[in-house]
């Protein structure tokens, strides 16, 4: 039997041979194609993401129902925070529910629906960050209003400034999304402008919030006020610092990638931070690896800080402290007078130091009904009268 001579290197392959893959040819395919993520992993992650957001949605919905159940003030910092977080959780739940049925259709929605599901939740998170700045700034104002009542006149400008910043953030996102979808503008330029403006506002709000937390930690009256709300400086500082670090790290990452996007050695995620809608539109489909990173980033940079905010503004039973045997009877408040409960709120006599209710104190927090000075002075006056009557039987009693 004659040995088969080797085929020349340039000859055509035989009928049973697989042609070698030539990466220079567009019509050639690699020998094997495997998905970046197995389908069952992607389905499992979709289930986990959807369940987490759905549970948060149910929890916030229960909190809003408790606001009505306990007859708290309906329009308050607490209710607005919870409503924003409820809207955010609902949008994220709907977004991930799309991936159960059609992975491609979730990235090819109509322009408005696409912006609503992908970009608008970040706007809602910025609104919550702005509202946290407004909340803690008012804590400082109310703590200082006893000695500096003129600070209360700055509340209206503070409201207007917060509203203006929120509107700027919303309009920038909406305008850039419309230009990307309908205009002939350079998408990279639009994305860069939006990222630069949005992340700068995020960083500025985070810096402002850190300054507020620092001032609160140095003010004893602010500590008393937070104790009356069922919170404490340590709790406020821990939650605030965590939220600041998460939002700031997200913004700094995006600004870093934006600044060094021309550097080929710098590798970013499979998409531009919260401009996921633009990046997915350019690719027409979010890849498997990009989908995993998308869920992880949303979990760390969105779900975690939102959960902390919801925990801080959760609704508690206002009647729980009324049965506390250590509470002074004359300090009894209406069940509608607060939405933070703290069994230790009157353990210290230092709480009586804030015995003058500043003007306008009832209008800022939910629901505020603090006549600390009147109730304290009334209690002390009655106690003094009873003591005098006991020591001097001939002295007529005023009661």
UniProtKB/Swiss-Prot annotation:
The chain crosses the membrane at residues 47-67, 80-100, 112-132, 160-180, 189-209, 238-258, 293-313. Its main location: membrane. Residues 68-79, 133-159, 210-237, 314-399 are cytoplasmic. One of its GO terms (biological process) is regulation of macrophage activation. The keyword Transmembrane helix applies. Lysosomal integral membrane protein that regulates the localization and activity of mTORC1, a signaling complex promoting cell growth in response to growth factors, energy levels, and amino acids. Interacts with Rag GTPases and increases the lysosomial localization and activity of Rag GTPases and thereby regulates mTORC1 translocation and activity in lysosome. Involved in the regulation of lysosomal morphology and autophagy. This is Integral membrane protein GPR137B. The gene is GPR137B.
